[in-house]
From Swiss-Prot:
Protein name: Large ribosomal subunit protein uL5
PROSITE patterns according to UniProt: RIBOSOMAL_L5 (PS00358)
One Pfam family, short name: Ribosomal_L5_C
Presence of the UniProt keyword RNA-binding in the record: yes
SUPFAM superfamilies, sorted: RL5-like
Quaternary structure (record): Part of the 50S ribosomal subunit; part of the 5S rRNA/L5/L18/L25 subcomplex. Contacts the 5S rRNA and the P site tRNA. Forms a bridge to the 30S subunit in the 70S ribosome.
Length: 179
């Protein structure tokens, strides 16, 4: 069992039960999944760009990414329906906890001028979205092999009903929110 999963079961769950006065242990919110998405607009002109992005995403998450395709054709972007334009990974279970642990304790502190992440990125239903500007903050990415810096979106889906519960859950897990 991963370190964060143990922490969740032994420390966070009782703390949340006390704070929000849940009647059942099943009411305590938990992280359901983490979706890491990389939109690669350059893939329209050059399909090799997509391959390197997929490799990087696989190195970061430890899971093979799914290539996302365009839903609509957009003439101004020279984009046709069905063209590959991105990659995404949905993490659940052990891999999810390992990725979250690495994100909070290793990657986010490596961001330049890091003062904590925004409190305002909750969606109203207890999910948190985080944008990362460059993939170099992850320890698996070799600086010399990177052809282009790419950003990614990280969505943390929780079972929390409100943003307040979700914020408390992520804070307990060690997410560095701005004060």
């Amino acid at each position: 069992m991963t370190r964060l999963k143990e922490k969740f079961l032994n420390e966070i769950t009782p703390e949340m039960m006390k704070k929000f006065e849940y009647s059942s242990i099943m009411e305590v919110p938990k992280i359901e999944k983490i979706v890491v998405n990389m939109g690669i607009g350059d893939a329209v002109q050059n399909s090799k760009v997509l391959d390197s992005a997929v490799e990087e995403l696989q190195a970061i998450t430890g899971q093979k990414p799914m290539v996302t395709k365009a839903k609509k054709s957009i003439a101004t972007f020279r984009l046709r329906e069905g063209m590959p334009i991105g990659a995404k990974v949905t993490l659940r279970g052990e891999r999810m906890y390992e990725f979250f642990d690495k994100l909070v304790n290793v990657s986010l502190p490596r961001v330049r001028d890091f003062r904590g992440i925004s409190n305002k990125a909750f969606d109203g239903r207890g999910n948190y979205t985080l944008g990362v500007k460059e993939q170099l903050i992850f320890p698996e990415i070799d600086y010399d092999k990177v052809s282009k810096t790419r950003g990614m979106d990280i969505v943390i889906v929780t079972t929390a009903n409100t943003d307040e519960e979700a914020r408390e859950l992520l804070t307990q897990f060690g997410m560095p929110f701005q004060k």
